[in-house]
Amino acid sequence: MRQTTISKSPRVEVVDALRGFAVLAILLVHHVEHFIYPVYPDPAALPGWLNVLNEGVFTVVFGLFAGKSYSIFALLFGFTFYIQYTNQLAKGKDFSYRFLWRLLLLTLFATLNAAFYPAGDVLLLYAIVGIVLFIVRKWSDKAVLITAILFLLQPVEWYHYIASLFNPDHQLPDLGVGAMYTEMAEHTKRGDLWNFIWQNVTLGQKASLLWAVGAGRYVQTCGLFMLGMLIGRRKLFVPSEANTRFWIKTLIVTAIAFGPLYQIKVLLMDTADSAIVRQTAGVVFDMWQKFAFTFVLVASFVLLYQWEGFKRFTSILRSYGKMSLTNYVSQSFFGALIYFPIGLNLAPYCGYTVSMFIGIAFFFLQVRFCKWWAEHHKHGPLEGIWHKWTWVGSK
């Protein structure tokens, strides 16, 4: 690493707010898509203006946040690893193997989250891919950056695309993801609580992990984790003139890149006749346009956060972000109770617009809980358990 002198890293306010923003964005996406439960009111039974509004809500929420909120979350996961690793190094301790234990604990929270979120959990993916941070923790900045770029290039998809050019019969392996999601929807419709939970933590987790393979999420998450660690090393979230220039340049470059990347994605993924092109080059450009827009969001947020008015406006996101694990898992639990047959079964009565407003209302309830909890506790409920168990056996 570059640093020759190790000092404890202070808490960076913008990171908590940005994490809160990411969890809020995830919440809105989850509510609009009914937590991957595709049951909605019949459009024919709704007034025309509401159908138009519903389509607009879906387009805006998914266009702004789908695939980007998780990317922000992944960046901050890598950043948090750097902070924890550096803080322990400042005390003369090696956090490396404690971090592996922490990842193992994360699988427990992933199971808890998956129990009420059919095939939608991302925490298990993070627990698996997080091992890459352990591997590169002592690498130089240059080595980490080069490796991150290689991952972000989506090499697996390019391999299959190039192979298809030489062999027209080349096909991606059929992982059966579509059939798994169909089966998960049927289990959800049954309304049998214990069957619902069991299928979610078994078949659902399998479907989620295999979906991530086809969507290019594994290698992208590796790259994002490493970029987050580099952001920590370079202290790019700490306010300074140099960092402001960096984020302005990042905003300009990624905003310019997003347009053509998105158009190529439409050509290759949405309208291409060849399935192999859609599943390979199409996926690559889909991930790249999402990556570019992710940094448009991050850079914009960091730059706006230097303005006191924006900082006050987003103050509720800081407390929300400090309890991101609790808020992420609890939204799955309550989402199941709201939309699924095991609970109120409101999915057939809630279109995109109503679902979005339910999500917004639930966000404010979570914020209220976060503020109340923070008055009495240092960590959120799940954060406190994770912290306590992380350091079990330490002196």
Regions found by a protein language model. Name each.
Residues 49-63, 193-210, 272-280:
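Juxtamembrane membrane-water interface segments that cap and precede transmembrane helices
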Residues 82-160:
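Internal alpha-helical transmembrane segments
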Residues 94, 134-147, 230-252:
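Solvent-exposed interhelical
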Residues 11-18, 22-23, 248-251, 305-334, ...:
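Functional transmembrane helices that form membrane-embedded active or gating regions
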Residues 2-77:
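N-terminal signal-anchor module of multipass membrane proteins
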Residues 150-229:
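Long hydrophobic alpha-helical segments that form multi-pass transmembrane helix bundles
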